[in-house]
Amino acid sequence: MANKQNYYELYRKSTIGEALTDTLEELLINQYISNSLYQKILTQFDKTINEALSNTVKAKTTFKGSLHTYRFCDSVWTFILENAQFKTEANEIVKVDRVKIVACDANVQDAPPPK
């Protein structure tokens, strides 16, 4: 039997992930889809978005800032930077007061349960 790969649900909180979730919840409430289909679609989204980002995004960005907080739990790093500065390959600079960066171990077979 093949190993079932689990994916982080991190991108469900992105703009596209929230739009998908809102749409699916509306369909579920109006009984156009079942709860199992709802879960299956979200699981497929988790898989697809992770694979698409790892295979197609090639742009590089550097960043620096003052480390306010860091945490490591369940193979997930979380950093909160203050007065951060992001620099793109095109030398565009974006400054933000505070940013949260979440980094997940891509080699983890079993993603932790959502919190």
From Swiss-Prot:
User: In Gene Ontology terms, what is one molecular function of this protein?
Assistant: TBP-class protein binding
Which cellular compartments is it found in?
Nucleus
Gene that this sequence comes from: gtf2a2
- Report the main location listed first in the record: nucleus
Species in which this protein is naturally found: Dictyostelium discoideum
Identify the keywords attached in UniProt to this record, alphabetized. Nucleus, Transcription, Transcription regulation
The record, for CDD domains, names:
TFIIA_gamma_C, TFIIA_gamma_N
Keyword Nucleotide-binding among record annotations: no
What is the recorded name of this protein?
Transcription initiation factor IIA subunit 2
The entry sums up its family as follows: Belongs to the TFIIA subunit 2 family.
Q: Name one Pfam family in it.
A: TFIIA_gamma_C
Claim: Isomerase is one of the keywords in the record: no
Give coiled-coil spans as residue ranges: none
| Function according to Swiss-Prot or TrEMBL | TFIIA is a component of the transcription machinery of RNA polymerase II and plays an important role in transcriptional activation. TFIIA in a complex with tbp mediates transcriptional activity.
The Gene Ontology biological process annotation of the record reads: RNA polymerase II preinitiation complex assembly; transcription initiation at RNA polymerase II promoter
Gene Ontology cellular-component terms for this entry are: transcription factor TFIIA complex
What InterPro entries does the record point to? Answer: TFIIA_a-hlx, TFIIA_b-brl, TFIIA_gsu, TFIIA_gsu_C, TFIIA_gsu_N
Record text on subunit structure and interactions: TFIIA is a heterodimer of the large unprocessed subunit 1 and a small subunit gamma.
